[in-house]
Amino acid sequence: MQLCGFNVGLDQRFFLIAGTCSIEGLEMSLDVAGQLKEACAPLGIPLIYKGSFDKANRSSGTSKRGVGLDAGLKILDEVRRQLQLPILTDVHDTSHVAEVASVVDVLQTPAFLCRQTDFIRAVAQSGKPVNIKKGQFLAPWDMKNVIDKARAAAREVGLSEDRFLACERGVSFGYNNLVADMTSLAEMRNSGAPVVFDVTHSVQKPGGLGAVSGGARDMVPVLARAGVAVGVAGLFMETHPKPAEAWSDGPNAVPLKHMRALLETLVALDDVTKKNGFLENNFGA
């Protein structure tokens, strides 16, 4: 699969979707995107910068939601222009799809909306690549139905069916808790779409701090190493210079100063995993 000018697949180095959870202004976005670019470039990691203009799914009605659609798209467009990076953001409503797709390079769907047929059809018919997140309630093999739905919608309007990513972001395991099942990353390959592992949301504790979500930030490197060892096409990780001050999802964000060291480890693992191939593909023979 071609994505933003680079090849994606299990025979390629993983690509990275990274940025702050919520867009926190132009200066912050340029700083984070610039540091991520500097970390990824020497390691040969293709980078897609992400930022959310609206955090529609919040634990509390008083939680900060973001800079809004118009300001957010302007900031993302400026990041792309100044740093020459492809841009991703999430959409939450069919009414926003066309406007957002006119600015960003990749759309992303919230996990909770993965079964909403009209919504999936709208993003699939936008003409842009789409990172489709698996719901926390969904079995990994059911993502094939979601991807097939998106492909059928694209086919109806004469668009390429080879534009969709299947993203794992953890599964609900009791109250206020998510776990990451590593077998899901392999199971989701059967969707026919490249698999992305959203590491930072997989360590989230939804609503775990009462009015806000908690998270186990120290487990991000652990799950990232495990996911890369399984073999994935891409990784998704949110980061922040000062996670404790982040507008959203600070408890599960990677401290920006540690991102380069983490990526160096992950590249080494990725090289070993993909060089040796995937023995599991032969176990059914």
Swiss-Prot record:
Predominant localisation class: cytoplasm
Signal peptide annotation: none
Keyword Chloroplast on entry: no
Domain of life, per lineage: Bacteria
GO BP: any one term: keto-3-deoxy-D-manno-octulosonic acid biosynthetic process
Broadest EC class assigned to this enzyme: transferase
Protein EC: 2.5.1.55
One GO MF term attached to the UniProt entry: 3-deoxy-8-phosphooctulonate synthase activity
Pathway(s) this gene product operates in, as recorded in its UniProt entry: Carbohydrate biosynthesis; 3-deoxy-D-manno-octulosonate biosynthesis; 3-deoxy-D-manno-octulosonate from D-ribulose 5-phosphate: step 2/3; Bacterial outer membrane biogenesis; lipopolysaccharide biosynthesis
Keyword annotations: Cytoplasm, Lipopolysaccharide biosynthesis, Transferase
Subcellular location: Cytoplasm
SUPFAM superfamilies: Aldolase
Family: Belongs to the KdsA family.
Protein name: 2-dehydro-3-deoxyphosphooctonate aldolase
Organism: Acidovorax ebreus (strain TPSY)
Gene: kdsA
